Regions:
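Amphipathic alpha-helical scaffolding segments
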Residues: 86-93, 108, 113-116, 212-217
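A generic secondary-structure signal for well-formed alpha-helical elements
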Residues: 95-106, 199-203, 253
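Intrinsic-disorder/low-complexity, polar/charged segments
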Residues: 85-86, 93, 104-110, 223-234
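Secondary-shell segments that build the walls of catalytic and ion/ligand-binding clefts
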Residues: 1-53, 118-281
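Short, glycine/acidic-rich hinge or "gate" loops at secondary-structure transitions
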Residues: 84-86, 102-114, 258-267
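Short linear sequence motifs
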Residues: 9, 17-20, 60, 93, ...
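Residue-level detector of alpha-helical recognition elements and their boundaries
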Residues: 79, 106-107, 210
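Long, hydrophobic/aromatic-enriched structural stretches that serve as scaffold segments
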Residues: 39-103
Length: 281
């Protein structure tokens, strides 16, 4: 692989983030009049709940961008062969969740339902963390907050979310798995599973995308032969990771722009320019 081609791929992500970040920040998260978002904020029974959903989704775009910046760092010399896949998986996950909350195909009631489910999922995980701290963090305080959110959900007309044993499993709705959300919003289940294989260090994934065989039939232990591998990442893999990052970031931004009534053209042009920089073999 040539250093020039790698440099252009890395620069494509950096340029994309710089250009789109300026445009996105310029709108100051304020929806235009007559946009879907403006109508939801003025018509929903509790505008604060709509605002919470928008804030959650916008934060997730920030998270996705942070992972994208980290990708650049992991691919800059001395380049890593495993960490970049973790960055892109995090970017894909955050972008998909943002799209799920910014979804332009749902109404305000469904948006708040999803927002409540996302809040419950996070607090439920926080409560489990608290239970491991041996009293440093009181899980009862977190469960109290969950109860308050569930009460709010019921006041807004959402029924309790219980399993067959009458145990609470969500608020608003049961939270779908990230894999299902990635498939629903980006149709990238295959790529997400590949990235997950690398993140979880499965041998089949590492041997294909994180290492290269250098020697075979070598004595590794007494009476044991095997192969030696070295960490390695190909130009094809780098290009895949960069394109995946740019594409999922674009789709999340597009959903936000469409919902808030902003002009998507500068973002689309920045995306095309970034992808065009990448030299495919």
């Amino acid at each position: 692989m040539t250093k020039n081609a790698i440099s252009k791929s890395i620069s494509s992500v950096e340029d994309f983030l710089e250009q789109t970040g300026k445009v996105w920040a310029g709108y100051e998260h304020k929806p235009f009049p007559n946009s879907i978002a403006a109508k939801e904020l003025s018509s929903f029974i509790r505008p604060e709940s709509i605002g919470t959903a928008y804030s959650q989704a916008a934060t997730l775009i920030e998270v996705a961008a942070d992972y994208a910046f980290a990708l650049k760092s992991t691919l800059t010399e001395p380049a890593q062969s495993i960490a970049p896949w973790t960055c892109v998986r995090g970017c894909l996950e955050a972008a998909s969740l943002s799209m799920w909350l910014f979804d332009t195909k749902i109404d305000a009631k469904e948006r708040v339902r999803r927002s409540l489910a996302f809040r419950y999922e996070g607090l439920d995980q926080q409560a489990k963390l608290a239970e491991t701290t041996k009293g440093i963090v009181n899980p009862k305080d977190i469960h109290k907050r969950i109860n308050q959110i569930e009460q709010l959900a019921q006041e807004l007309g959402y029924p309790r979310v219980l399993n067959k044993k009458n145990k609470r499993i969500g608020v608003g709705q049961e939270m779908p798995s990230v894999t299902k959300i990635v498939k629903k919003m980006l149709n990238k289940e295959q790529n997400y599973r590949l990235l997950s294989g690398m993140v979880h260090a499965h041998p089949w994934a590492l041997q294909h995308f994180g290492f290269i065989q250098t020697h075979s039939e070598q004595i590794i232990f007494e009476n044991v032969k095997g192969a030696y591998f070295e960490k390695h990442i190909t130009l094809d893999s780098i290009n895949f990771l960069c394109v995946e990052t740019i594409q999922c970031m674009f789709e999340a931004l597009k959903m936000n722009f469409d919902l808030f009534g902003w002009d998507i053209k500068p973002i689309a042009l920045a995306t095309k320019s970034a992808v065009d920089q990448i030299q495919f073999e």
